[in-house]
Amino acid sequence: MQVNIAAALVERLLSEAAVDPTREVCGLLYGNEGRIEAAEWTPNVADDPDRTFEIEPAALFMAIRLERQGGPRLIGHYHSHPNGSAEPSPRDLAAAEPGKLWLIIGGGQARLWYVEAGAFREAQMIIN
């Protein structure tokens, strides 16, 4: 799977994660199957935001509602691993929704993943 994303958007997400490098940042990804068009930061409402993330339910429900009304297509989520790599954790896999992209930021890089047959597979992120 190949997915295009603007270099400026990748830089913005890396910068966002660097603002508070001890906590996981998270948000929503919008676009289509071949391109991430936009990302929206959402509050991390997890009980332990230093180790995990939970997208604010109201923000997620609003994104789904807007998509159903003809708004931007919600294609996935992003989050950071403050003390780890940009690879999915077992916790990520347990929460993963098939058909959605997972952009993970860690170790100064961003990598893109999707679930297939119960496992994460890395997507080729084409930065342009």
Segments predicted by a language model, with ranges:
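Conserved beta-strand-loop surface patch within small alpha/beta domains used
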Residues: M1-L74, P82-N128
